[in-house]
């Protein structure tokens, strides 16, 4: 036949290709959906569910290769005032912008997650507690010097409290570190 196909073969090949294409699209959608389950809706960074898995993974890695690991706990000071004064929409925008600022302060190999509310956690791979404290101080200063946009363009200044825990000195597992 035409193009070397027997009658009906071209239709079958076209149908098989269409099914394969659909299967690939479904697989991609599933993968994206699964990934979305680990992303915080407001800030677009990882959520607490992902953080728990990532902490387990990083602790195992630190143990296996005898490498340090630091965990930073960040809590915005008096963030309730931002929500009360400017509304939750502005509060969400501030949290989203804060997430961007935090991402700029860490390496790509580090993990930033919104733990909940106005709390964030950062996993610093291959980083001891001493270096973790220096990074925490740099983040604290950066946030304090960043102007966040409030309602009506009014600038909002934030301060942040940061705790640092190191593996293995402060904890040898997720429970001890978080």
Residue ranges and their predicted role:
Residues 47-70, 80-104, 113-117, 121-122, ...:
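Conserved long alpha-helical elements within nucleotide-processing catalytic cores of c-di-GMP signaling
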Residues 25, 84, 124-127, 144, ...:
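Residue-level recognition of strand-loop junctions within catalytic nucleotide-signaling folds
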Residues 14-21:
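Allosteric cytosolic regulatory segments
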Residues 29-46, 60:
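Amphipathic HAMP/coiled-coil signal-transducing linker helices
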Residues 114, 143-160, 170:
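Catalytic core regions of nucleotide second-messenger enzymes
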Residues 14, 27, 31-34, 52:
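Signal-transmission coiled-coil "S-helix" linker that connects upstream sensory/regulatory modules
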Residues 7, 129, 133-137, 152, ...:
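Catalytic-core segments of nucleotide cyclases and related cyclic-nucleotide turnover enzymes
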């Amino acid at each position: 036949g035409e193009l070397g196909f027997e009658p009906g073969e071209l239709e079958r090949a076209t149908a098989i290709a269409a099914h394969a294409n659909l299967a690939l699209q479904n697989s991609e959608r599933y993968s994206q959906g699964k990934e979305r389950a680990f992303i915080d809706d407001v800030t677009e960074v990882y959520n607490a569910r992902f953080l728990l898995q990532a902490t387990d993974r990083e602790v195992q890695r630190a143990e296996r290769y005898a490498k340090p690991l630091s965990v930073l706990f960040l809590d915005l000071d008096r963030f309730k005032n931002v929500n009360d004064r400017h509304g939750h929409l502005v509060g969400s925008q501030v949290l989203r912008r804060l997430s961007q600022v935090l991402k700029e302060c860490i390496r790509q190999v580090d993990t930033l997650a919104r733990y909940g509310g106005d709390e964030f956690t950062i996993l610093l791979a291959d980083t001891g507690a001493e270096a973790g404290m220096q990074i925490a101080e740099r983040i604290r200063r950066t946030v304090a010097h960043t102007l966040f946009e409030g309602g009506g363009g009014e600038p909002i200044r934030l301060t942040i409290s940061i705790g640092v825990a190191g593996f293995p000195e402060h904890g040898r597992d997720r429970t001890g570190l978080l």
